[in-house]
């Protein structure tokens, strides 16, 4: 996506995006995760354009995107609006996984879960995921979906790696209870666990404080 001076300064251009995705597919990687807010939507655009230019068929990739950091957060109106924008930017008519980026304190859980369930029933989304919230909030959302016969979450994207293991206390046990898969973010602690020296002179190492 397009770099911003104050958000994800380490992003790559379109040509590099295509090389990275092409190499990933050739290496057996097929899960591509993005969000409507990454690089202000241009991350989705670059990914969709790369898949088209590389001639990668839709059934060869698992596409995931997220919703929350937008006007209306997780209201029904916002979800319905944002999914259409995401699908258009990615150049597809469905997502394999749609993730709520955060818990929305301003919208009733029932409204959010019903809206997400409607996307699954409409064929715009195949599965639902959540990210970065308290375990009790995730549990309450699952209970709400279960009680109403709505689609439950099948994945949790939490902050989890060998250095940061807080979610082993409560979130991961809740995920086990519901048979929810983990798709952690920063699994290599922003690269710190993947190189012999703690720091490097890369733009991401200098500007990304996420461990």
Residue ranges and their predicted role:
Residues 17, 24, 32, 47, ...:
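Conserved, mostly hydrophobic/aromatic
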Residues 48-55, 83-88, 170-179:
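Short amphipathic alpha-helices and their capping/turn segments at secondary-structure boundaries
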Residues 14, 103-211:
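Beta/alpha (TIM)-barrel catalytic core signal, keyed to glycine-rich beta->alpha loops juxtaposed to Asp/Glu
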Residues 57, 73-101, 107, 159, ...:
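Active-site gating/metal-coordination segments in enzymes
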Residues 59-71, 156-159:
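A short, structured active-site edge motif that brings together acidic residues
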Residues 1-15, 67-80, 101-107:
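Active-site mouth loops of central-metabolism enzymes
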Residues 11-24, 73-91, 111-114, 138-143:
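Short, acidic/polar
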Residues 1-61, 93, 121:
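N-terminal binding-site loop/beta-alpha segment at the start of enzyme catalytic domains
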